[in-house]
Amino acid sequence: MPSYQYLLSLLFYILDCTDRFSVIVTIHNHRVGVLMIVLLQDQWKSYCRTISLLAFQSFGVVYGDLSTSPLYVYKSAFSGRLNNYRDETTIFGLFSLIFWTLTLLPLLKYVIIVLNADDNGEGGTFALYSLLCRHAKFSLLPNQQSADEELSTYYQPGVGGIISSPLKRFLEKHRKLRTCLLLFVLFGACMVIGDGVFTPAISVLSAISGLKDPGPGGIPDGWVVFIACIVLVGLFALQHRGTHRVAFMFAPIVVVWLLSIGVIGLYNIIHWNHRIFLALSPHYVIKFFKMTGKDGWLSLGGVLLAITGTEAMFADLGHFTAASIRLAFVGAIYPCLVLQYMGQAAFLSRNMSAVEDSFYQSVPRSLFWPVFVIATLAAVVGSQSIISATFSIVKQCLSLGCFPRVKVVHTSRWIHGQIYIPEINWILMVLCLAVTLGFRDTTVIGNAYGLACIVVMFVTTWLMALVIIFVWQKNILLALLFVVAFGSIEVVYLSAAVTKVPQGGWAPIVFAFVFMLVMYVWHYGSRRKYLFDLQNKVSMKWILTLGPSLGIVRVPGIGLIYTELVTGVPSIFSHFVTNLPAFHQVLVFVCVKSVPVPFVPEDERYLIGRIGPREYRMYRCIVRYGYKDVQKDDENFENHLVMSIAKFIQMEAEEAASSGSYESSEGRMAVIHTEDTTGTGLVMRDSNNEASGTSLTRSSRSETLRSLQSIYEQESGSLSRRRRVRFEIAEEERIDPQVRDELADLLDAKEAGVTYIIGHSYVKARKNSNFLKTFAIDYAYSFLRKNCRGPAVALHIPHISLVEVGMIYYV
């Protein structure tokens, strides 16, 4: 490749906007005749405006936590035996440690390297795990298919095909290693949930602690804790309203906060000790450890708090772009934080007695109250961002089948992924209040908070190493270099944080253990239940021996049988027809499953297939969601399903005609675009209330059932808003007679009504199971199932159309 092409590639990589520019290159006789880069002025301005706007918005969502760290870093660092070293050299060395920690981890590791490891624009621990599962067979999701690999979001653009290696084959071969990888990821997720407890507690308590000594009117510690608890209760109580209504204020608050602490830091440098600039040299780090020894190492638990919130840069990548997050950090966050830490160090070098409240003591008295108000607001913003991140991480665990079913509410019509989980919100509030009231000290809370944050960073480092090997397909030595460079720093900080376990560091370990236990029990029980279904599914031979009527009465209507199986017929079907020998004229086995991608495009969400011969009128529908997709109540699901099946019938007939074989192929699945109604052979017309009523009158439902449904629809807001449509076979199209008959049966069944059938399962351990398995299944898993949301609620099934079939699973 000529050198100028390398330069162009480098330019486009840096700008991250290759689709926004026009590049004209004229080459003559293998030499550069004319090299012209025409930047379209309007597109350039639009790009700059977009990046600037996203960078501005990222202040309120991404950097609220990181920007409030100056409230408590120096106090936590001097809380131990380092308090015995009150001299300028120690202060300078401590600031040098903070500066180089900010430079090496947030700036070098995350901004320059980790932000490149996005999963279709998404970031975070699960994004890395998802990338690994798609480029190697690491996934433990039970119902994966080869058709999932055909999703447009499955493989990264620009990444080569999957290559085999001894390490890859070794990890894929040993299931225990893949289980350990999942547990490693879940452990990091549990620590993020711990952040959702400790961040609001330490941020709000640190901000309110300024009231302890604003002058002669200082208030007691008990009142500080009480006021902090009131603020925390208000913060969690307002979560159900959604943050989008006040989110426009978040970024300005953090920007004002950053400018304030930056200016105050610069003032303190000039006013107290401008020699602090010398501490930018790493030489002071060496002097610091030579002077303090083990005591200096123990103080790293406090220095660690300077980078809490760094993981949010990667975790919240999906809401912004890598370029905007980089711009915000390099242009504002990094310089303002460095100035503030430098200013506090300059102040402390002349006022060592103020170390217990160094931030507020370093603020000029005339600016105390404005800074106090801004600090409190910034603490709330930082807390809000981590609470939202906790909701997101629980949703992702739910998608992996590693968390009990909870209610996920989409709080914003415009912001995708803005969710609220009531159960998690109230659990976080109770734990946060318990931490605030129990510890009552930011230093102790900081010990717990720091341990949780460094563990999450450590998990990211090792996952990034695997991504470098298996996704980026780089040399293993490069991955080892990454681990050595950053993992060694994090191990040093982790070792210091572990020493704080008796002084509050035990809290994140306990929280992580409890959440990990819940996740593992749920995953174990759900997988055992799935394996039971897989081993006891009905054979097609048995289905075929029954004939087209299935040996039962086929009543009008469509029966949707929900199952986790993507192949075969679940045992719930045989259990139902054995006890009630009647079923609907059209059967659809529906599987709602998760795939290891962040989002599944709407036009690729549905997979439709046929079960058995054509005259059986049995179909399969697989609905696929990504780990960031929110399964909202689809008001048009039934209409989409009918159109999708109709389109599949047409596609199957066309392929059969072209191949000359009219036998249906069992197991064949096709992606159906639900928004595209062409080629279905149907016409969908809006139906008014009168027409709808006429349609119901012609149906086979009894007068009592129609009356109950009418009352239910009036009381249910979601059903009353559903679009009423009527399907007709297009007369002008030339349709094969067999296809027309099948479409007519489908429409008659739709007019008769749709019934949802799900299993009401009771999971029990086998009699010969050991004690641990019996306890896990019969007590722990059973308790979680009884106290979480039912499958009908999670799947948004209308109660008036629901039939539950009881089954006992002996696993």
From Swiss-Prot:
InterPro entries: K+_transporter, K_trans_C, K_trans_N
Cytoplasmic compartment spans: 1-52, 115-181, 239-245, 318-326, 388-418, 472-475, 525-811
Glycan attachment sites: N351
CDD domains assigned to the protein according to its UniProt record, in alphabetical order: Membrane-FADS-like (cd01060)
GO biological process, alphabetically ordered: potassium ion transport
TM regions (residue ranges): 53-73, 94-114, 182-202, 218-238, 246-266, 297-317, 327-347, 367-387, 419-439, 451-471, 476-496, 504-524
Membrane topology: Multi-pass membrane protein
UniProt subcellular location: Membrane
Protein's UniProt keywords contain Iron: no
Distribution of this protein across tissues and organs: Expressed in roots and shoots.
Disulfide cysteine pairs (residue numbers): none
A GO cellular component entry from the record: membrane
One of the record's GO molecular function terms: potassium ion transmembrane transporter activity
Induction: By potassium starvation in both roots and shoots of young seedlings.
Keywords: Glycoprotein, Ion transport, Membrane, Potassium, Potassium transport, Transmembrane, Transmembrane helix, Transport
Record NCBIfam families: kup
Role played: High-affinity potassium transporter.
Family: Belongs to the HAK/KUP transporter (TC 2.A.72.3) family.
Name by which UniProt lists this protein: Potassium transporter 7
Source organism (scientific name): Oryza sativa subsp. japonica (Rice)
Classification of source organism: Eukaryota, Viridiplantae, Streptophyta, Embryophyta, Tracheophyta
Gene: HAK7
